[in-house]
From Swiss-Prot:
One of its GO terms (molecular function) is peptidyl-tRNA hydrolase activity. TRNA binds at Y17, Y69, N71, N117. Keywords: Cytoplasm, Hydrolase, RNA-binding, tRNA-binding. The active site is at H22. This is Peptidyl-tRNA hydrolase. It holds the Pfam family Pept_tRNA_hydro.
Length: 194
């Protein structure tokens, strides 16, 4: 196995979904690609990828946006792991999380998928839940709105003003996770409650 990291931004393909809450993982990857000065190119594993290094002397990374719908992201992720010889413990899935308030980023290794079908499909395709997750909070749906309706809508106007800061924080979390490990990244992004 190589020391290369696979960073996967979960979302749905197509311009009609690009600004949805469900696509916040892919928005974070756009920020990381911008930092690398890279452009996404189509890979045979059914994903758009950018290969390179994050920062001077930083780790070798493959940024990937599956070209499949969110709920069937596992095939492209497993295909990229095989192609680039990347172990599951060097996979970081960046995804929306309704159980975390908007404008909050949390990190974890493994565990349950919390009803997130994209994560469930990745776990199945990798035959393990032991990969890293950067969970980008989008908040819970208001009132009795269905979760699917909520995550497949664009961010609210007030949220759009804060979104660049959230994407920046999530991209920083990905970099810190690779550079200093899970515990250091959690300590920075999971502030202690007073």
């Amino acid at each position: 196995m190589t020391d290369t990291w696979l960073i996967v931004g979960l979302g749905n393909p197509g311009s009609e979904y690009s600004n949805n809450r469900h696509n916040v993982g892919q928005m974070v990857l756009d920020e990381l690609a911008s930092r690398m000065g890279g452009k996404f190119k189509v890979h045979k594993a059914r994903a758009q990828v950018v290969e390179g290094r994050l920062g001077i002397g930083g780790p070798r990374v493959v940024l990937a946006k599956p070209m499949t719908y969110m709920n069937v992201s596992g095939g492209p992720v497993a295909g990229l792991c095989n192609f680039f010889d990347i172990a599951p413990d060097h996979v970081i899935a960046v995804h929306d999380e309704i159980d975390i308030p908007f404008n909050t980023v949390k990190l974890k290794m493994g565990g349950g998928e919390g009803g997130h079908n994209g994560l469930r499909d990745i776990s199945k395709a990798l035959a393990t839940k032991d990969y890293l997750r950067v969970r980008v909070g989008v908040g819970r749906p208001p009132g009795r709105m269905e979760t699917a309706d909520y995550v497949l809508r664009d961010f609210a106007t007030a949220e759009k003003k804060e979104l660049p800061f959230l994407l920046d924080e999530a991209a920083d979390a990905v970099e810190l996770l690779m550079d200093q490990g899970l515990l250091a990244a959690q300590q920075k992004h999971h502030p202690a409650k007073a």
